[in-house]
Amino acid sequence: MSNNAIKDWPEDERPREKLLKRGAAALSDAELLALVLRTGDAAAGKSAIDLGRELLERFDGNLRELAQAELNELQQIKGLGLAKAASIKAAFTLGKRFQARRLETLERFTSPAQVFDFFHHELRDNRKELFLTLLLDGKNRITRKVQVSEGSLNQSIVHPREVFAPAVRESAAAVIFIHNHPSGDPAPSREDHEITRRLNEAGEILGIKVLDHIIIGDGAYFSFVESGLL
């Protein structure tokens, strides 16, 4: 059956019809990818679902790795050209933006778990470390998210002067620091401990409270406050 065009399949087995009848959650990852790809490779006798399955196999079924893939990596699948690769990249990017913009609906943060819930989709797929600062007002309401750095963290890159400049400029009452560990393990390094100590001291001098520093891994997080280190 996989060598036939999807339009020739029984109606209840076609991804689009299945989605319309049963909802998107009823589709497999390969079927969802097929809808993004729209067509297969007729010359090779591959349906869009076949291409979706090959993509998943190429990345060991890991959607996180697939989301991180560059266009040239996606095109290594025979029958998957630039247009299809761009569609996949666009779909994953749109999902990330949706997660990021959920932040705008929040009135205030109440716990490290809530921070993790809102940011792990955005940060866990990055191959580089990103350091973010959340600016909050006196009622712990988010006013802005600032990206401080991208790349391996060290004390010269994450310097208190650069980190607190937006908070001072916008009269923030408090800040929350967030960064990711591309390895997936959120356990803090010695450098993470030292950076947190320095930033907390700077916050005390400036009168800007550091509410937490949260490290995001793959499905887990580390909170300096919950661990009694801040």
UniProtKB/Swiss-Prot annotation:
GO molecular function, a single term: metallopeptidase activity
UniProt-listed Pfam families: RadC, UPF0758_N
Any one GO BP annotation for this protein: proteolysis
SUPFAM superfamilies: RuvA domain 2-like (SSF47781)
UniProt-listed InterPro entries: MPN, RadC_JAB, RuvA_2-like, UPF0758, UPF0758_CS, UPF0758_N
Residues annotated as domain MPN: 108-230
Family as reported in the entry's similarity comment: Belongs to the UPF0758 family.
Keyword Zinc-finger found: no
Lineage: Bacteria, Pseudomonadati, Thermodesulfobacteriota, Desulfuromonadia, Geobacterales
Protein's UniProt name: UPF0758 protein Glov_0523
Binding residue positions for Zn(2+): 179, 181, 192
Keyword Protease annotated: yes
Motif extent (JAMM motif): 179-192
UniProt keyword terms in alphabetical order: Hydrolase, Metal-binding, Metalloprotease, Protease, Zinc
